[in-house]
């Protein structure tokens, strides 16, 4: 049994960077990351053993962060449209290491303000649910 979160993270990283041309970080962004970037966060998975392998229900959150006094949510929502166009229920996921993705769905899309309104941070969180199997 391999950790399915590793392969799904690699797949999302590649596809998000391609769809948005933004820097994608794993877990958190470093100090000075810039004004627009994406963070892959909130990865969870549960596993069921079947007759011929494992089935994993995976959840991953794509956190789109924009910092600018002039844009508000408009730029973050424009980026979220790029993400949702590239990665949606019709997307086929190809993974390595014997994993096969059978389902991809969007659980939620949420706007989130920064902790301090004076920071002018605007975020859109997209949570995906994926079912993958490993034989």
Q: PLM features: what roles do these ranges have?
A:
Residues 34-44:
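A short, hydrophobic beta-strand-centered structural micro-motif
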Residues 1-30, 43-135:
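Charged, amphipathic alpha-helical segments and their flanking helix caps
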